[in-house]
Amino acid sequence: MRKLHLDSLTLQLRSDLQCIKASSSSLCDQMDCMLRVLQDLKRSSPPPSPDIEKTCAVPQRRVPRRDNRISHRTSDLSEADSACCMDLPSDVSPGSCGQRGLEWDSGYSEVSGSSLRGEEDDIVEEESETRAPAVVLRRLPTPSCQRLSSGGFLNSRQGRIRPKSTSDVCLEQWRGIGLGSDSQDWTGCLLSQSRSRQPLILGDNSFADLVKQWMDLPENGDEEGRRVRDGGRWLHKPHGFLISLSGNVKRRLGNMSRLRHSDQEAVKRMSCPQLGCRPLSPYYHQSLSDIAEASTNLLNCRSRRPIICNEGAGFL
């Protein structure tokens, strides 16, 4: 059985290999046909015109120009520092040199702004060349600068106005907050111009205290209006409420005076209460019954003050 199974598998593999060989041969034939067709098309196509050759040659000539422009951007500052000495052409004036410096250096930073502007010019030129291939745009040669000692390079950049960034504007605004008549710090201005100048005192219920203090804050800063409102608040109360309030005040004042009078008339309490027993004596002169009676009197006493008995410390 195993032998028959192996024979069937080998036959199936051989048939698969033959199919793969046939498919590979057919693919090779198709590739050969495609190559022949391409060669025939290439031979039958007409030769290119000279105008097309010129348009194809334009991008190849622009590659070194772009490289030169990038190198000019990166080496602009280094050439200025080394004080390059080159003669200005007769048709170029210092004003055009200043305009050129403004064109190459308009932005927040001297390298990023010039690079971005140069890339935009390259994109515009490439689009124009793709639209009209016969026209070739060329930039005017960059005017050279004089020596730094003569002041030509520095004078060309004097008329340029650098725009302010957002951080500079914010910094000026923050500095302007504290510049007043009293010239306080901005933290002092913030604390003095706040709505509530009273100290915050929180009790057990902090949230309720916060809400109460917030509700008690005046809407306007004038204190005279607040006093008028407070006086009017008591005047608008009903007559019965005022009478009951005065009665409560009188009652409390009477209780306070009564307590003070009772304290003055009270007899000074002894440190050791009078228990109604005979004076204490040494232990061996008393009997057990007297000791038990004294202990019960001490337990039934309602005095909240400590009992200090220097003479009878041995009994207690």
Curated annotation (Swiss-Prot):
Give the family, as the similarity comment puts it. Answer: Belongs to the INKA family.
Q: Name one Pfam family in it.
A: FAM212
Describe the inactivation phenotype: Dramatic reduction in craniofacial cartilage formation.
Q: Where is this region: Disordered?
A: 108-130
Reading the lineage from the top rank, the first entry is Eukaryota
So what does this one do? Inhibitor of the serine/threonine-protein kinase pak4/pak5. Acts by binding pak4/pak5 in a substrate-like manner, inhibiting the protein kinase activity. Required for the proper migration of neural crest cells during embryonic development, probably by inhibiting pak4/pak5.
* Segments for region (Inka box 1): 182-219
Give the comment on domains. Contains 2 Inka boxes (also named iBox or inca box). The Inka boxes bind and inhibit PAK4 by binding a substrate-like manner.
Has keyword Nucleus? yes
Relate the assembly described in the record. Answer: Interacts with pak4/pak5.
The recorded induction information for this protein reads: Expression is regulated by the transcription factor AP-2-alpha/tfap2a.
Location (main, coarse): nucleus
Matching InterPro entries: FAM212, Inka
Subcellular location(s): the record lists: Nucleus; Cytoplasm
Q: What is this protein called?
A: PAK4-inhibitor inka1
Keyword Glycoprotein set for record: no
Keywords of this protein's UniProt record, alphabetized? Cytoplasm, Nucleus
Q: Name one GO cellular component term.
A: nucleus
Renumbered to this chain, region (Inka box 2) spans: 289-316
